[in-house]
Amino acid sequence: SLSTETLFLKAWKILVALGFLAVFLLLIDANILGHGARYGSLSTYLVFNDQCGTSRGFIWRRSLELFSHFPLSHKLFGFGPDTFGILTTRSAFKEMIAATGQIFDTAHNEYLQYLLTIGPIALIAYMIFLSNSCQHMARYVLKALITESTAVPYAIGCLFAVICYGFQAFVNLNLPIITPFLWITLSMGIATVKKYTVHKVK
């Protein structure tokens, strides 16, 4: 028979998968199939155009266009750290002003920002590191809940802090006042997992 931990984990996986599938289907219907109007006020969030997200749609589109015109070396390793503003002002300054009335020196999407500045190799490595860290913390939380470990609240807090940061990074940029807290909570979560693993081995 399946253990409680396994059943709990499978239930969460199914729930998360169904949630992502529902959002994916809504986006397909609203954008590719052109049925955005049927969602009423929700179309503001579902339909992607240059005006969505306070003009984030514009800079996201231009970011992907800029990346598509990169030479091979830049497509692999990016244009250089913190050079997004140079890219946009050099190639899309007039278009930015005409379309949005402002200048974008960031992509307002941390993953797009990394894609253009440090390249897909570094971006993939970063995302794998975050996802693996969350996976290790999630496994610990499930085991700790069953064993009623006193460290559960700390582990849950660290896990969801990292997950929330990962989701908000789709519409924001990494800031010096915020990003250090990601690494602090991530380190605390991993340290908790390591401590639990060491005690278990002993």
Per-range role (PLM):
Residues S1-L72, P81, I86-R90:
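A membrane-periplasm/extracellular boundary helix in multi-pass inner-membrane enzymes
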Residues V47, C52, D105, E110, ...:
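Membrane-helix boundary/interfacial segments in multi-pass membrane proteins
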Residues R61, Y111-Y114, I163-G166:
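Structural preference for long, well-ordered alpha-helical segments in enzyme cores
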Residues L76-F77, E95-M137:
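A conserved mid-to-late transmembrane alpha helix and its immediate loop/hinge
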Residues S1, F129, M137, L145-V201:
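Transmembrane alpha-helices of multi-pass inner-membrane enzymes
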Residues E5-W12, A30, Y39, P120, ...:
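Polytopic membrane enzymes that build or remodel cell-surface glycoconjugates and lipids
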Residues L26-H35, F77, F84-A98, I163, ...:
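Membrane-interface helix-loop junctions at the exits of transmembrane helices
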Residues S55, I59, A99-A107, L159-V162:
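Juxtamembrane loop-helix boundary motifs flanking transmembrane segments in multi-pass membrane proteins
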